[in-house]
UniProtKB/Swiss-Prot annotation:
PANTHER family: DNA-DIRECTED RNA POLYMERASE, DNA-DIRECTED RNA POLYMERASE SUBUNIT BETA. Zn(2+) binds at residues 1017, 1092, 1099, 1102. It comes from Mesomycoplasma hyopneumoniae (strain J / ATCC 25934 / NCTC 10110). Pfam families: RNA_pol_Rpb1_1, RNA_pol_Rpb1_2, RNA_pol_Rpb1_3, RNA_pol_Rpb1_4, RNA_pol_Rpb1_5. This is DNA-directed RNA polymerase subunit beta'. The gene is rpoC. Keywords: DNA-directed RNA polymerase, Magnesium, Metal-binding, Nucleotidyltransferase, Transcription, Transferase, Zinc.
Amino acid sequence: MNTKVSRQYAKISENSIQKISLALATPEDVLEWSRGEVHRPETINYKTFKPERGGLFDELIFGPLVDYKCSVCGRKYRKSNENQLCIATKECKIRGSRILSKMARRYSMGHIALNAPILHFWFFKIDHSIIAKLLGLKVFEGNSKVPTTITKAAIENLIYYKSHIVLETGGLKSLEQNKIIDISEAGLIYKNALIEIIEFYPPGSEEHNALAESISELADVTSSKIGREYGVDYYELNEIIEEFSSARIATGALAIEYLLDKIDLRAEKAAVEAELAGVQKQIYKNKKIILKNQKRDKLYKRLQVINAFINSGQDPKMMIIRNLPVIPADLRPLVQLDGSRHSTSDCNELYRRIIIRNNRLKRWKAAHAPVIIIQNEMRMLQEAVDALIDNQKKSTNQVTTKEGRPLKSISDALTGKKGRFRQNLLGKRVDYSGRSVIVVGPKLKMHQAGLPRKMAAVLFEPWIIRNLIQEKKVGSIKMARKMIEEENPIIWPHVAKVIQNKPIILNRAPTLHRLSIQAFEPVLVRAKAIQLHPLVTAGFNADFDGDQMAVHIPISPEAIRETQELMFADKNILGPKDGEPIVNPSQDMVLGLYYLSQEKAGAKGEGSFFSTYEAMLKAYEFRSVELHARVVLPFEQVKPFIAKTMRGHLISTVGKFILNNIFPANFPFIFDDNVDELELNYPSQIKKYVLPYGTNFREYIQNLKVNEPLNKKAIAKIVRQIFDTYDGLLAKEDIATVIDQLDFGNYQNCVLRYEKLRDYKKQKLPVPHLSKLSEFTIFEYSQLYKQLQQNGPVESYRVLEDHEKAELLEKIWFKYNNMVCSILDKIKDLGFHYSTLSGTSIAISDIKMAPKKHEFIKEGENYINKLNTFYAKGLITDDERYVLAIAKWTQIKNDIQEDLNQSIKDDNQNSLVMMMKSGARGNISNFVQLAGMRGLMANNVKALKVDAENERVVRSIVEVPVKSSFLEGLTSFEFYSSTHGARKGLTDTALNTAKSGYLTRRLVDVAQNIVVVAEDCFSDFGFVVKDIIDTKTNTIIVPLLERIEGRFLNKDVYDSRGIKLASAGTMVDLQTAKKIVAAGIKKVEIRSILSCHIKNSVCKKCYGKDLATNRLVSIGEAVGIIAAQSIGEPGTQLTMRTFHTGGVANVEDITGGFTRLIELIDSHEHPWGKPAKISPYYGIITKISDLAEKNAANKGFLITIEYKTSKNEKAEHIIRIEQSQKLRVKVGDKVIPGQKLVEGPIILKELLAVSDARTLQNYLLKEIQRIYRMQGISISDKYIEIIIRQMLSKVQIIENGDSNFFIGSIVDISDYQEVNGQLISQNKNPAFGNVIVKGAKQIPLLSNSFLAAASYQETSKILVHSVISSQIDKLEGLKENIIVGHKIPAGTNSNYEPKSKFDIRNPLSFFMKNNR
């Protein structure tokens, strides 16, 4: 049942909330919320420290300080008496004391009955004054026929009693309607008004004499010094004018209230729409009228405010406060410090000022004080209420502490990082959590983490206490708690017992992406540090140099199940960013595997034959054969599966036999570092290493080429292929169906039942999966059989209990899903073991000097001397000399690097070289600095925008390089230069991290509500993709293969012979993608997020493959957040140095790096550098001529484009280009709208204006991809598409037709299409609008959810507009549901499909009788 609840919010459950709406609170609403009036400014009694009656902490109003204690007589009650009235004494009955818990102090409100109407600060200060827009006051000054609009500042002066306004002219010509009377012109205006009024009365009459006297007094005052300085007495004159005429002049909130009461909103709307139509016509006639555009924008905003009040049906007078709510006492606490001192919330001081001024005003009114004193008190009261509402926004008279700090008002408590939204609603402190330093846990399994037992004892305390009491180790909770605190040895077995099947969640800050939070099975360790598996560190971006991690405990059964099924480390093998494994071995492990897989010609024991693998190991242990020696084993000993088809002996090193032994029997044998597509290349590769019986082994091996060992990249490829081969293909439900059919008599034949199952692609299970599943099933059944036999004989046909089946299912399911991780664990163990055995250590003698270094340095110095000579002769400029010098030293360093590369090419025993070649640590660049030269250093120069626009050389690199290497040692200048450069790197990184974090936050807000919600949206619009090519360098940025793999086709794909390669509606897998590219196809039309028809969400087919699971995305996946994290997480790696070449600020520099990314995502109107000129038409370049002007600085070109008009007539368009801009076109070139004519960044709004949304989408996608790919970071297109879709998701209405939209409003594109569809179906006029591009900063503010928008930025502005329009938040997105305490509408709380990753039912449910 849907019930509208608008009062007593504390009494409803947050789970029952379906919608939230904001509205203006009426004085009656405030009285209904309130439990009493606060009329005294006191807080607590200074002697007793008890709250004062009628004060800001009154227990009768705000609730008791002690649970269920009467606030009047002090009598204590039970919880069962809650909400009853205390009747213990007569005073209790009179005061109506209610029995409540102290929690009431968090939601019980009071009120202050104001003795004067006060205008709510937000409505005249936020967003250029809502009141000014609503009233739209205009006045005809003198004889002018064009009215002057009264400004926001003039209305503020009116509110603060600094000026008066003519509310009614009373037929007086000297008074203009809405005229603001300032102190400077008051004397003249009042004089003219009185002269006009006196004419209505006959001379000699009482009225005439009184008016004549007033005119005489006014003349005396205005001519006197006091009158000129302090002005006239407004109030006396106003009374005279109102007494003798029907004119009315007023000031303050009363004047505004009068104006709001008189306004006719519908008439105002009609007038504004008529004026808007006139302005629109003028703009269409002449598009260059900038002032008219500004006027139109002002009218749009005014219309928006008027429409808000009309549609919400609210009375604008409710913007005036008569009863001021007082927030609950516990939300503005008074805390006792040491001794008798107290610390209080700033709000209490602000409330106190209001009460004091309000009470004083009441006394002045009662004493009939002069009007001027009362008006002054009302102004002070207005200022006091303003300070309470929003002290920071007050331009003057901010209320400050003694130290000068502005007090925090209610608005400040909402906004910013420390405000209610971000500090208390979106981010909360979590109980059952702890943190500690992390250390490596090399012996852990991948799903395990080492938890210090002291932490476990505290985190799992309630369970341990229950266990101790159940087993009668203690008699009470208190004793158990004491035992845990004292760390009594009795507790440790119970701690170990309690943590079974209780996963823990580890989080490392900064949580940049979802791999920063993963779940593990806890393993108790005696140390105080958390042990972390070495392979998962990459996901957390953790190292062991003092990093700390937080631990959290999921408590409810649902949370535990979700943690185990979705968050365990074995479910997070692929990185969501690019779909590549993130658990690749690194450092020690890589070094160990590199050492293990090395081959050495002529090593001890080479050519030896061993009949078994164990015999080979024994020989290696007895040192009769070396690890790197190539030996021979019978084929069936190594690969028994293939031995049936291939006979003979296999050649490899001892190390490689050991390495291959850890892989499953049906995984291809790894012979060398050529590990691409092992399955496909296996038959051709294996022939070289298989010897028929009777071959001379030693002779054959001597002629065999020595293979390269496995480096980091090769190992990563192997890991990927392990994942592709052994990642689970079945759902839990499938395995449950098999278990349900098995008993102790037939479990040995389980493989027959598994053969009948089909994987998620509807295909038969591969042999590796069948063999492993049957192996796990047979093992678990036999274990259970043995266990049951201990209690007596077990019949083979015995039917298993449901709980036994569920237990079997859990064990088999875990092993099946853990296949990849178990192999990775073996790789890890092997890597660590052999890196230790390799004995790798480094000495200074390992660094080999570059042989030709000094020759290259000499060459560079000679070149620089020549440059200096040319410069001295005036043949080159200083800038040219600098650029050439930098280029030369860069080339010299590259030459030294190449020379070093050649010298260490065959040095495989050098430890440093081994580390570098294997990819364990360091690269050739580090080696060059050690053994060659350090090279050029960064210079800390501020690059200005004007430098980029004028293409000046920015000297961001020190001209003199560091010629020494670290081996030789640096001179004092070189040392200084080095530290200077290093420091710049550190500061850049620190600044970059903060900017990157802010970018991620904005992106999350942009895309947070995008969730996969449907199977198919049936869109027939596609998105044509091709290689993304950098047109400047003509290099491929993103190949077609990457862009189509994992996406659905929108149209059939045919090769040049007309043979169909793939059908529309099918997902392109890697093999199909390779086939399409091999056929020479350049363009493919795919389903895209940019064309998806689902409102604010996306369907499975438009999204395609989930990169984190390597299969089709599941319904419920929060792809918007994944996209934001994937783009934001590598942001820190993007360089912030705009001019990283140190040369001329050319286009390549300007368009690279973090700065350019921010420009694109925020849709900057003034990008860094000189913007590119673009073609506005389809046409041909007919002429490029020099622009000859007298002023040499204005030289440039004129590009003439010939195009056809709508009437098919030829026309010319001339574009002026500055001389410094580089042309990208020549005469005769065909151009299309949006095409660059010169180098430089394109302004997004301009591109959208001359082309269409699809062109802009392609441009953004290409530019963002280029920025990341230049840094070697690969991000999937689909993530960028999600952000681009949001950037282009709004339409600005230019004609409203028969719709309810108003001209100038910005609406969601899906709402626009929906409304227009309905209008067209009813034969009505549709609305017309233009798609607009908005940056990531503005999109969240335009959200349909005011909660999501207000929690992002500009909180007060969002709330003001939501209040006046009475906006309804339907709680559709993720943020708004978190704010109200709901589960998010994604993942396990979405309408997921059966057998999907989010279908995490209790295993028992698969075997329940009613489930069959």
